[in-house]
Amino acid sequence: MTLPKDKLFLSEQTWRWYGPDDPVSLWDIKQAGATGIVNALHHIPNGEVWTVEEIMKRKELIESVGLKWSVVESVPVHEHIKTQTGNFRKYIENYKESLRNLGQCGIHIVTYNFMPVLDWTRTDLAYTLPDGSKALRFERAAFIAFDLFLLKRPGAETEYTDEEKTKARIRFEQMDEKEKQLLVRNMIAGLPGSEESFTLEQFQHELDRYRGIDAEKLRTHLIYFLKEITSTADEAGVKLVIHPDDPPCSILGLPRIMSCAEDFQALIDAVPNESNGLCLCTGSLGVSCANDLEGMMRRFGDRINFVHFRSTQRDAEGNFYEANHLEGDVDMYHVMKAFLELQQRRKVSIPMRPDHGHQMVDDLKKKTNPGYSCIGRLRGLAELRGLEMGIAKSIF
């Protein structure tokens, strides 16, 4: 099948930018070849309205270098909404107002997640790979050691096997005080994309809010939230895209409800509004060997409005690290092929971004946001761009 060049739909190449304080500048991003920016107003506290004035100020800054604010990632969902406590109805109304304002300002894709307390979780933010570059890693024994011996979460010991607890004890005894404190910081101290950071005591208090909230109840709260806001999103021309759980399993006793194809299907069935869409993150979902990423791309293609391309290398013990974008356990060729075919079928260029990247080359000497250094993502974007173009040239 041959498509005329002007009829070929390739992805919109985007880049996550953390605003004026990001060490990676808009000019850096432009030189990387991205055309769209993925951004959020991190200076606005969770739950408050994003005003037209604040949105336009940021949009004009992005456009001043010839880039486009393509995707919001994220408008955070307040914890009161997730637990349906306190001022949750007020925060839902504020969320609606933010969606109206974003639509009015011409920004039409809004990412969010419904993960309790934590955004994404890693135990090591500077795992050294054989080539000397650094990646993000999740080590299960260290994670359990944090839960049992540092956080000392009530009832945690019942959630792990005897073998896991023994490995965690050995791992904990190997740590010196500096390593223990680093693990605590890595686990709970506001990673990029997380809007809150906590002391251990505050963190446990936040976990306690979810006592009595299992996966079924949290899903009910998510569906309630979406039924409240999707009509507003429809009217504003905004597509909501939910990010999957990272990692896609229960952690610290917290429920997870966006971890697999069945979770996606349940959400679409419950809230069929056109604005109820998905962010397919191959890195988050790829941690579970049960997730067929190519199949999910094809099955949910009409709902996928944003894609994160990332690969992970996992092992049998539940550990994983973030691999190079074209390596690891994700079959990026077939996922990209399905993505490319989806865009031709829908006749649309869908935003994608290289999700995370290794800290490498010059960035090893710099202070960077974990996972969001420049050169590793530049490499990832170049590889993904080449893969997409190569597939397109070979089949269209």
Curated annotation (Swiss-Prot):
UniProt entry tagged with the keyword Lyase: yes
One GO process term, biological-process aspect: D-glucuronate catabolic process
Associated pathway: Carbohydrate metabolism; pentose and glucuronate interconversion
One MF term in the entry's GO annotations: ferrous iron binding
Catalyses which reaction(s): D-mannonate = 2-dehydro-3-deoxy-D-gluconate + H2O
Its EC number(s): 4.2.1.8
Cofactor(s) demanded: Fe(2+); Mn(2+)
Superkingdom field: Bacteria
Short name of one Pfam family: UxuA
Keyword Nuclease: no
Keywords: Iron, Lyase, Manganese
Classification via InterPro entries: Man_deHydtase (IPR004628), Xyl_isomerase-like_sf (IPR036237)
HAMAP family, sorted: UxuA
Function statement: Catalyzes the dehydration of D-mannonate.
Record-stated family: Belongs to the mannonate dehydratase family.
PANTHER family associated with the record: MANNONATE DEHYDRATASE (PTHR30387:SF2)
Protein name: Mannonate dehydratase
